[in-house]
Amino acid sequence: MPTSVSLREDDPLLKDLSEKKQSFRRNVVSLATELKEARTRLAEQERSCSKEAMSRQEAETRVKRMEDEMHELAKELNEKVEQIRASDVATEKFVKELADIKSQLAATHATAEASALSAESAHSHCRVLSKQLHERTGSLKEHEDQVTRLGEQLENLRKELRVRESSQKQLRDELLKVEGDIMRAVSVVKTKENSEVRNMLNEDTPKNSERINKLLTAKDDEIARLRDELKIISAHWRFKTKELEDQVENQRRIDQELKKKVLKLEFCLRETRIQTRKLQKMGERNDVAIQELKEQLAAKKQHEADHSSNQNLWDKSGFKIVVSMSMLILVAFSRR
């Protein structure tokens, strides 16, 4: 053994061969190591390829799912846009109705104010008419009192006339009695044919006749004067009575007209109050409707704000860029 070793050491060929053999062994070991490493790398590449294939499949699945989600989101977005448009149309309609209701309410308030003014003017007119009616009633009462006094005066004149007629009748009765006495005395004188008595009677008869005639003339004059006064008073009374009757008739007609006006004004006042109550109720209902519309509009605005906040996430440029980059990366992986 030592001899062979020494031979190898002495022989350069053997030495070179030995070195080449060792180098070959080292190369074989290094090649085996490289082969092992290559196999390891190949296995790793296979695993990475399988992982890439799986990731590509997952990416494709994700892309498909994202496309479906984006399609659904676009569909929901279109539906939300349609809902928002419908809500805008409804809002415009509500706003228009609200403007109409406000205009109607303003017209109602104007009508109520005009009705209140007309009612106030009707009240003042009623007060004026009542005052005039009271004054006319007072003047009518005064005229009635005056007519009553004139009637009493006329009745007193009639009583006085009746008393004077009765006194005239008594005077005529006395005159007839005196004439009867005279006639009886004359007949007695004729029967007795007493000339002295006849002469005395002839002397006394003219005196008595003259006195009686004077008395009768005075009474007749007084009766004529009383009759003239009675005629004048009767004519004046008839004139006053006719004038008062005309005034009473005019007053009654005016009173009837005033009563009609008062009734008409009361009716207008009742109608005005009824219309005012109706307008107040309409105003209250309009206020309630306006409040409900405001609440509905506020709720719709809040709902639209919530939806817009949810939709703004999809409308943001950063989110769009991230989605675009993700899709590009997935497409690049799928191409590999």
From Swiss-Prot:
Superkingdom of this protein's organism: Eukaryota
Coiled coil ranges: 14-87, 128-261
Compartments reported by the entry: Nucleus inner membrane; Nucleus, Nucleoplasm
Disulfide bonds: none
Gene ablation phenotype (knockout): Double mutants NEAP1-NEAP3 display reduced primary root growth, and altered nuclear morphology and chromatin structure.
Keywords, in A-Z order: Coiled coil, Membrane, Nucleus, Transmembrane, Transmembrane helix
InterPro entries given in the database record: NEAP1-4 (IPR049932)
GO cellular component: a single term: nucleoplasm
Placement of sequence motif Bipartite nuclear localization signal: 240-261
Chain ranges passing through the membrane: 313-330
Major site of localization recorded for this protein: nucleus
Topological type in the membrane: Single-pass membrane protein
Quaternary state and interactors: Forms homomers and heteromers with NEAP1 and NEAP2. Interacts with SUN1 and SUN2.
Protein name, per record: Nuclear envelope-associated protein 3
Record gene name: NEAP3
